[in-house]
Amino acid sequence: EHATIVDLLRNDMSLVAKNITLKRYQIYEELTAHKKITGQMSSWIQGDLPTNYRSQIGDIIYKMLPAGSISGAPKPKTTALIKDIEKKPRGYYTGISGYFDGDNLDSAVLIRFLEADGSYRCGGGITHKSVLTSEYQELIQKIYVPIF
């Protein structure tokens, strides 16, 4: 699953940057919250933005959304399917939050977070090899850490 997500994100980055490289792959961390441990897998992907990226940061972000890790592939088809299946807008869910200080962008895709009204949404990735019961257990585990 992680390899698929990395490939999707490399493709997203290729829309806005050149010389895309995978700097670090499958960094595993254990996160602890309220005496519960969950595993987190991440990778670092890097590319060269255009020299005038500061004036284009909004367009750059827009071109990359929704993140391939959310939509899957092929993105135009999967986003159309999601829109047809989900009858109400996602709001902030699966968007991004972060800041741009003029040089650096630090952001995260909002897949597990609390809304101001106290509602909570959570998602997970599936592939054609996914096992429904395993995916459900992973979802429960990932919900548990931030809520409890």
List where the protein language model places each region.
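Conserved hydrophobic core element of enzyme catalytic domains
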Residues: 36-148
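Short, mixed-charge, low-aromatic patches
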Residues: 1, 26-32, 96-99
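A conserved active-site cap/scaffold subdomain adjacent to cofactor or substrate pockets
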Residues: 1-14
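Generic beta-strand/beta-sheet core signal
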Residues: 6, 25, 121-123
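Short helix/loop capping segments that flank catalytic or ligand/cofactor-binding pockets
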Residues: 13-16, 129-131
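Metal-dependent phosphodiester-processing active-site neighborhood
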Residues: 15-39
